[in-house]
């Protein structure tokens, strides 16, 4: 059940009445979310990638979905952003999947939302989580549709390519830092953090050429000064080995995969493969790298995502437009 913590804007032109900060329980901690109250009965639950908080990761897309009538629940995973959980900056895949389950349950409890009209929207790592979650049998999730934007579909394929952009010195030192941080975790000590992205030669999670676009795409003009853009070193290896696209053939619900053709961070091929294996998979390919949907291809992607949501959340089985009938 959602608890209102306060109202607030944060997006130009958006009033506190249109967006309020709420919290929902996941495990023993609270996840903090923005709730945009919609008018058409459908809801989009949203989250960003590894270490990407809800504001830079979802604000621009959430505002467009809300303007089209959708409710939105955009949340921070535990240990990240405004959500609870200690230690900070740690990504635990099983916990983040549980956060998604709790977020979907929260969305279903919102008074204006019809529980059968809930879609998930994820970017990068969060998109991978949705591939994994949607592959579960009916009754084990609340998803009616999924948008996977630049999905991390197969870390075992994309990570070796990403490592090719690193220097030998970093390749030798980073595993030692990650192991040291893992040992700190076992001892209950605070994590050693590294930047989410950096130039070649930096001790960062990603040093692919397109990783440098992240700040420009998600945080233009330092719009979100509180976003720390770091991750625990102990979290990098589990993400690198994460392969959520392998179960895509079990996804029976509508899936839209938004694939950047020149993506150097998660690669295009694994996401394409996953979407093609999904029985109800749809693919939008756009020119550009990992952050294309936030940059030059933004309007194209928003239009395609709204069309997908409209077709799969606002039409009944007879094909009638429920929004028009309301």
Predicted features along the sequence, with ranges:
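Alpha/beta-hydrolase-fold enzymes
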Residues: 131-217
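Short beta-strand/loop motif that positions the catalytic acidic residue
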Residues: 251, 257-259
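Catalytic histidine-centered segment of alpha/beta-hydrolase-like enzymes
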Residues: 288-302
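The serine-hydrolase catalytic nucleophile loop
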Residues: 50-63, 77, 269
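Conserved alpha/beta-hydrolase
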Residues: 64-84
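Alpha/beta-hydrolase active-site loop
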Residues: 90-111
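Conserved alpha/beta-hydrolase "acid-adjacent" motif
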Residues: 264-270
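N-terminal cap/lid segment of alpha/beta-hydrolase-fold proteins
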Residues: 2-38
């Amino acid at each position: 059940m959602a608890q209102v913590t306060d109202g607030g804007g944060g997006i130009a032109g958006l009033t506190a009445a249109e967006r309020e900060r709420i919290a929902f329980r996941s495990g023993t901690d609270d996840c903090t979310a923005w709730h945009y109250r919609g008018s058409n009965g459908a809801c989009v639950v949203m989250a960003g990638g590894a270490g990407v908080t809800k504001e830079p990761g979802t604000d621009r897309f959430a505002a467009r979905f809300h303007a089209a009538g959708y409710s939105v629940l955009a949340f921070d995973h535990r240990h990240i952003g405004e959500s609870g959980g200690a230690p900070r900056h740690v990504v635990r895949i099983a916990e983040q999947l549980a956060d998604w389950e709790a977020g979907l349950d929260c969305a279903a409890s919102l008074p204006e939302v019809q529980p059968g009209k809930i879609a998930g929207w994820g970017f990068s790592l969060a998109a991978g989580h949705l591939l994994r979650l949607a592959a579960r049998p009916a009754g084990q999730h609340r998803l009616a549709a999924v948008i996977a934007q630049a999905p991390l579909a197969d870390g075992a394929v994309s990570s070796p390519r990403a490592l090719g952009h690193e220097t030998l010195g970093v390749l030798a030192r980073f595993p030692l830092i990650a192991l040291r941080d893992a040992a700190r975790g076992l001892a209950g000590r605070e994590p050693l953090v590294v930047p989410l992205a950096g130039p070649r030669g930096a001790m960062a999670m990603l040093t692919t050429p397109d990783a440098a676009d992240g700040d420009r795409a998600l945080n233009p003009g330092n719009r979100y000064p509180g976003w720390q853009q770091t991750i625990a070193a102990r979290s990098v290896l589990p993400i690198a080995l994460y392969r959520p696209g392998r179960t895509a053939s079990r996804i029976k619900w509508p899936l839209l995969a938004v694939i950047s053709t020149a993506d150097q961070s998660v690669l295009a091929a694994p996401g394409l493969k996953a979407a093609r294996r999904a029985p109800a998979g749809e693919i939008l390919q756009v020119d550009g790298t990992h952050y294309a949907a936030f940059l030059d291809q933004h309007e194209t992607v928003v239009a395609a995502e709204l069309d997908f949501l409209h077709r799969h959340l606002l039409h009944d089985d007879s094909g009638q437009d429920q929004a028009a009938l309301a």
